[in-house]
Amino acid sequence: MAEKLKVELVTPYKRVLSEEVDEITATGALGEFGVLPGHAPFLTSLKIGELAYKKDGVQQHMALNWGYFEVEGDKVTVLVETAERADEIDLERAKAALGRAEEALKKLSPEDKSFRIYEAALERAAIRMQVAAKAARK
C-alpha cells in the first residue's frame, strides 16, 4: 500500500493541483468524506464546497464548484467547474457576491426560474469566504 495519494485536480481551463498528499477531504452530494491511501475505489459527484488536503503535515484548503471525485488505487482525480486555493480568493469580492445573491433572493420566490441560480451563487460566495478565512488564519 502506498503512503501517499496522487491527486490530480483539473477544471475545463487548467490543471489546478498535481500533488502527492497524505489525505484529502471534500464535500460530496451526500456530505463530507475523506480519503486516505489504500481507500477502496470510489466515485461520487461533488457539490459546491470545500476540498482540503494534508501534505507533509500542512493543511491546504480550496473552494470548489460542482464536479466529480474518483479514487482508483492510490490515485485521486477531481474534475470540477472551478477551483480556487484559499490564498487566491478575494474576500471582498466574495462578500460583495454574497450580498448581491442575498438581495436577489429576497425579491424572488422559490418558484422563480432565477431562484436556484442565486441560491447557488449565495452558496459559492459563502464557501469562498469560509475557505479564504482559513488562509487568513495561517
Swiss-Prot record:
Keywords: ATP synthesis, Cell inner membrane, Cell membrane, CF(1), Hydrogen ion transport, Ion transport, Membrane, Transport. GO terms for molecular function: ATP binding; proton-transporting ATP synthase activity, rotational mechanism. InterPro entries: ATP_synth_F1_dsu/esu, ATP_synth_F1_dsu/esu_N, ATP_synth_F1_esu_C, ATPsynth_dsu/esu_N. It comes from the Bacteria. It is found in: Cell inner membrane. Transmembrane segments: none annotated. It is a peripheral membrane protein. One of its GO terms (cellular component) is proton-transporting ATP synthase complex. F-type ATPases have 2 components, CF(1) - the catalytic core - and CF(0) - the membrane proton channel. CF(1) has five subunits: alpha(3), beta(3), gamma(1), delta(1), epsilon(1). CF(0) has three main subunits: a, b and c. HAMAP family: ATP_synth_epsil_bac (MF_00530). Belongs to the ATPase epsilon chain family. Produces ATP from ADP in the presence of a proton gradient across the membrane. This is ATP synthase epsilon chain. The gene is atpC.
